[in-house]
Amino acid sequence: MNPKDLAPFLDLANHHANTTAADIEDICEKVKKYGFNAVFVNQYFVPFAKQKMGPTGKVGTVIAFPLGQDFLEIKIAASKAAAINGADELDVSLNVGLIKEGKWNESFEEMLNIVREVKAIGQKKIVKFILETGYLTDDEIKKTSVLILKSGADFVKTNSGMGPRGVIVRDVELVKEATEGKIKIKVAGGVDTYEEAMALINAGASRIGTSKAVEIITS
């Protein structure tokens, strides 16, 4: 696969606190120009990005990002608002504390509620749950991935890009092994080069979130 063929695998993201409308317009134009999968923006900019991307362009956003420890009611409300206002894909940060404490039922119920509410707005809305693998053991990664699969979500996402580390190939291998390849995998965090992207895709990733999408395909 040559660098330009990677474009459909890439989500071009801007989740900075100082992002402006001009920044969002810029990345929307790049998504359209290079054929990336979607533009990913903070919730506030979802309607603006949807307007810029047009009816066929895909817009994603993040929920409870990056800490994941919002009240469930807030996560649900934010997810619904994002979906109603034009988000096609939602990357939701899980409450890692629940995972570390072994509160599997509570974590699973959170997933189920969010998936149900988003899919009620539109069955084609894509829900991803973020593991934040840098905080988790191999067993925690695998067990949480199985719960994400069972919840009806569309993707396991490995990292936010704002945790203790970015994605590594081992993360993808663990998710794929645990779920027997039955759920798609999105990776993020430190994927800046064509070589890094290809290593992750070869391991089983089907989507990459990055702010360096243009650099990856033009390298």
Which ranges hold each PLM region?
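Surface-exposed amphipathic alpha-helices with a cationic face
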Residues: 50-54, 108, 112-122, 173-180, ...
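Hydrophobic faces of well-ordered beta-strands that scaffold small-molecule active sites
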Residues: 6-14, 39-41, 57-63, 90-92, ...
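Conserved anion-binding
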Residues: 79, 89-154
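Generic N-terminal amphipathic, Lys/Arg-enriched alpha-helix
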Residues: 1-18, 25-31
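Active-site cofactor/substrate anionic-group-binding motifs, chiefly glycine-
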Residues: 38-90
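Glycine-rich, proline-tolerant flexible connector loops at the mouths of alpha/beta enzymes
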Residues: 28, 32-48, 65-67, 90-109, ...
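Glycine-rich phosphate-binding active-site loops on the catalytic face of alpha/beta enzymes
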Residues: 61-66, 84-99, 150-168, 187-219
